[in-house]
């Protein structure tokens, strides 16, 4: 197995680049819970600090960063609402980034998957798992505060509408949304580029300012991620 030779801070807070002796580079985050991984990812020790390798084929946020995301609104102390948290792969790296003074509310609809997310949250006190349907944000309004960032990764035909509805409940004015657009979940017959354009128009018609659109190939085929700012 290749060995790490250096770890460098990227231009994004609490996100690092690990260089290995085989010449490869990979993203990593500083492990909030030393000694424990989440999804089988490699733990990397460098100069007395433990990092977790961040696999872009398992995490769309990592893929977006490697594909040129200009800015990551998720930083130390950020409050994040994550729709579609699944078993905790990406939200665990969000947990590393925001540190203990941040909060990550993870909404997941599947009871079986939430059980896995709960196991992750047991060791990570800044993750708050919620078994809920993202179509009904009023059902978790009493436990989720206003957030700085809304991250949406749900496989539904009306995923953009669900994201906008949640933003109206929870996203601060001038807060950011990272929306994963899953073209094949919306329409299997259309060109993904047409779908991306139509979904971005929905956002812009709902007081979102588009900052960047990133095609996630080769990490996720027929997926894009849209970074936008909510104007309220």
Curated annotation (Swiss-Prot):
Enzyme Commission number(s): 2.1.1.-
Single GO molecular function: rRNA methyltransferase activity
Function statement: Involved in pre-rRNA and tRNA processing. Utilizes the methyl donor S-adenosyl-L-methionine to catalyze the site-specific 2'-hydroxyl methylation of ribose moieties in rRNA and tRNA. Site specificity is provided by a guide RNA that base pairs with the substrate. Methylation occurs at a characteristic distance from the sequence involved in base pairing with the guide RNA.
Chain residues that bind S-adenosyl-L-methionine: 89-90, 108-109, 133-134, 153-156
InterPro entries named among the record's database cross-references: Fibrillarin (IPR000692), Fibrillarin_CS (IPR020813), SAM-dependent_MTases_sf (IPR029063)
Pfam family for this entry, one: Fibrillarin
This protein's encoding gene: flpA
Alphabetized CDD domains for the sequence: AdoMet_MTases (cd02440)
GO biological process annotation, one example: box C/D sno(s)RNA 3'-end processing
Signal peptide limits: none
SMART domains: Fibrillarin
Family note: Belongs to the methyltransferase superfamily. Fibrillarin family.
Name of the protein in question: Fibrillarin-like rRNA/tRNA 2'-O-methyltransferase
Listed NCBIfam families: PRK04266.1-1, PRK04266.1-2, PRK04266.1-3
Keywords: Methyltransferase, RNA-binding, rRNA processing, Transferase, tRNA processing
Subunit structure: Interacts with nop5. Component of box C/D small ribonucleoprotein (sRNP) particles that contain rpl7ae, FlpA and nop5, plus a guide RNA.
